[in-house]
Structure formats: structure tokens, C-alpha cells
């Protein structure tokens, strides 16, 4: 929690990765140490829910359990998930399964052609079908704000955020969003984000690109 004058703001980073993603290297202890300046953080490893529970229970981090999912038509993130969602289900089905868990559909790096973006046309289609809750317009792995996605989000009255997409510990919180208080649940987070501010900083240091294969953990999967 941060106070500027008489105003209290809550800093949140809704797109981060730990070593469980396979293409990131951050151990959980180091992750917890680097997340200290944040008031709420979403753990969104690729196809894995293990780290969020450990960071909450063993390190007392205020976390949202999430997952970045390869739909076969680009990536989406599910927030407030209780169960992992299979990959390659297609965009619409993946979004519906997130909603079935009372989770939030978060679209990361929507038009970034260097990554698994869904693209502006598919994003517009999902918005028209009321299958999107949050759109990421600032990502620390990009030098620019996604103005095209931001205009689309505003036209559908959807909240926009900036997030780090941290794959190394020092990137955690490099881009973030501020809200007025901590949310009690998923729907309240969306409401708070409609009156939020985002802060974007490009931050993409060189990292080891060697991919680590993560085996399932009986204790970590919900």
C-alpha cells in the first residue's frame, strides 16, 4: 500500500512468471523477495498453477492464482482459477472455461506479433461476444503502449492495465497498475480497474532461453 499525499493507492502486477513456466528462471524465494513492493500480484505461469499456492501459503504473498494458456489461436490468461485449463481449446472455449470457474479473462499483449498474440480482430470478436474482462495494453517486454487495443477496450468499456510479464526476478513490478483498494473478489477487481491508472516501463533483460520441462506436481495442481 502506497500513500501519495492523502491518496492511498494499491500497486498490482497481473502478469508474472516463475520457474514453473519453463521459459522463466525465477525461484519462488527470489520471486517473493522481488515482489515486496507490490500489494497484489497475479502468478500466471504457462499451464501451471503450482507457484501461486506456495507463494501464498509459505511466503505470505497476496497473490491471485492464474495461468497463461495457449489456446491455439493465441494466448489468454485466466485469473482467479481453481483448476488448470487444457491448452489448444480455441479462444472462445478457453474463455468459457475460465468463466465456468468464475475467473476473469485477461488478454495479454493482444497485438504483439513477436509473441503469441490473439490479434486485434480476434480480440474484437471476443469483446463483441462478452468474453473479455481485462485487456493488457502495457507490457514490460514491449517498448510501446498498445494504443490499438486500448481504443478497442475503451469502446467496449473494458478496463486496461499494464503488467510486467516478468520472466526474471528483477522485472517484477516494472510495469504495474494502481487501484484504490484491495479487491475482495474477481468482480470487484474489474470494478476497481475501471477507475485505475497504469504505469508502463520497458524492461526485458537478456535471459537464458533454455526451456525447462516442468513435471506435474500432485501437491501443486488444483
Can you say where each PLM-predicted feature lies in the sequence?
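Charged catalytic cores and adjacent phosphate/nucleic-acid-binding surfaces used
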Residues: 1-24, 28-32, 50-54, 58-65, ...
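Divalent metal-dependent hydrolysis catalytic cores, especially in the metallo-beta-lactamase
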Residues: 13, 17, 31-47, 103-106
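Short beta-strand/turn micro-motifs composed of small residues
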Residues: 45, 109, 164
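Acidic/Gly/His-enriched mid-domain segments of enzyme catalytic cores or analogous surface patches
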Residues: 101-104, 108-113
Amino acid at each position: 500500500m502506497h500513500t501519495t499525499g492523502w491518496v492511498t493507492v494499491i500497486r498490482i502486477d497481473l502478469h508474472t512468471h516463475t520457474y514453473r513456466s519453463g521459459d522463466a528462471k525465477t525461484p519462488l524465494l527470489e520471486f517473493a523477495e522481488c515482489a515486496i513492493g507490490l500489494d497484489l500480484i497475479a502468478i500466471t505461469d504457462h499451464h501451471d498453477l503450482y507457484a501461486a499456492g506456495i507463494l501464498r501459503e509459505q511466503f505470505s504473498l497476496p497473490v491471485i492464482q492464474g495461468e497463461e494458456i495457449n489456446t491455439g489461436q493465441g494466448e489468454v490468461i485466466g485469473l482467479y482459477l481453481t483448476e488448470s485449463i487444457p491448452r489448444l481449446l480455441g479462444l472462445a472455449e478457453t474463455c468459457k472455461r475460465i468463466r465456468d470457474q468464475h475467473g476473469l479473462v485477461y488478454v495479454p499483449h493482444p497485438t504483439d506479433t513477436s509473441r503469441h498474440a490473439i490479434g486485434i480482430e480476434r480480440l474484437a470478436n471476443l469483446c463483441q461476444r462478452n468474453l473479455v474482462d481485462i485487456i493488457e495494453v502495457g507490457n514490460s517486454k514491449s517498448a510501446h503502449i498498445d494504443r490499438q487495443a486500448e481504443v478497442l477496450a475503451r469502446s467496449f468499456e473494458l478496463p486496461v492495465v499494464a503488467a510486467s510479464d516478468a520472466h526474471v526476478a528483477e522485472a517484477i513490478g516494472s510495469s504495474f497498475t494502481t487501484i484504490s483498494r484491495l479487491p475482495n473478489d474477481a468482480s470487484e477487481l474489474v470494478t476497481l480497474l475501471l477507475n485505475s491508472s497504469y504505469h508502463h516501463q520497458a524492461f526485458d533483460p537478456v535471459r537464458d532461453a533454455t526451456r525447462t520441462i516442468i513435471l506435474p506436481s500432485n501437491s501443486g495442481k488444483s
